[in-house]
């Protein structure tokens, strides 16, 4: 499968990229900066194409390499999002956390809707923090959102 992967340089992506390559998938990796976490061998794989751009910027979804990669993809995996635990949660950083997730997701959806043959699947991941915290409760996708910033 040809997969467009966005935001795959974090915790999940660092495990998912090698797994997908071992299982015969061709990956187009989109990131704001060259992945320092991937090995040179991984980045030089014939089954990886690398695009350096900001997927949260709407203009990147209108023409060029990113829209071409989306058009060629069978599926999209979106793991994009500014890291949550690396900085203090100032009001400006909280806005970055929201924008890095919502703007990217909206850009993907809008671009997919404009394609004649959009990718067959979109996997969009966020964080369990959306549901809040509890020491005695299990959360599912049907659970209500928490009453805090992440919810």
Language model features with spans:
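NAD(P)H-binding glycine-rich loop region in Rossmannoid oxidoreductase-like domains
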Residues: 44-107
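N-terminal Rossmann NAD(P)H-binding glycine-rich loop of SDR-like oxidoreductase domains
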Residues: 3-25
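Soluble, non-transmembrane catalytic domains of enzymes that act on hydrophobic metabolites at membranes
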Residues: 11, 19, 52, 62, ...
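Short glycine-/acidic-enriched loop or helix-start segments at secondary-structure transitions
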Residues: 15-16, 39, 87-88, 132-135
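Conserved Rossmann-fold NAD(P)-dependent oxidoreductase catalytic core, especially the SDR/UDP-sugar
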Residues: 94, 106-148
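SDR active-site strand-loop-helix element
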Residues: 6, 30, 76-80, 122-128
